[in-house]
Amino acid sequence: MEKLLAKMYEQSESKAEKKQYRVLNALKAAAFLNLAVFYFLYNINVAQGANPAWDYAWWQRLTLWSIVVLCGMTFSQGSNYLKWGLGLLGVGTAISLCTYIFTPQHPIYFGIFTFLGLAYLVVQPIHWWLQKSPGSCGWLLSAIAYDLTRHLTDGVIIWQGKIIGHLPSFLYGDWNVWLGLPGADFVSLEYVPFLPNIFLFLCGLYLFQFMSEHEKGQAY
């Protein structure tokens, strides 16, 4: 009887996770579609001059944040992220080359696809270790790390609205653009550096882990 109940529980758990993944994948697809719509309207309003004063930053920022979090939440459902990571890095490189050649006034360097490629390649080999932390604890630590590092591009570390540290200027330059420490002359229409966004990605990963742990607790 116990084996039968355990098997029924595993089946119901598997069905619940599959349903969660379907919902999350649909949201992720909607987020990428939203990004495509954004660039379509950006091209009309800003690039072509229909409305040069169009305030687009908030829309772009929220869309990129949502993509990073959702990709983190769906990370556990995949397996071959070496292939995905290299593929996304290739897409990001192609986008950078195309914008450099065809729209040099609106280039995209180290955008969302480049970041996701790096995130997949970095997180996959340590995913087993990250899972040792409870979802709630991992999410909290990732959120704190994100908050501490989200102003690195400005050369400061801020905690609860107060500057608690300054980074030396020699750390900033072309060699550290990918990390989140660009030089003063760096320009990119879409910039998603490794820091602080890797912690936002981990927030998504741990949020899904917490949801899964919570459901298992309810089932018991």
Give the ranges of each region predicted by the language model.
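Alpha-helical transmembrane segments and their immediate juxtamembrane cytosolic regions
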Residues: 1-220
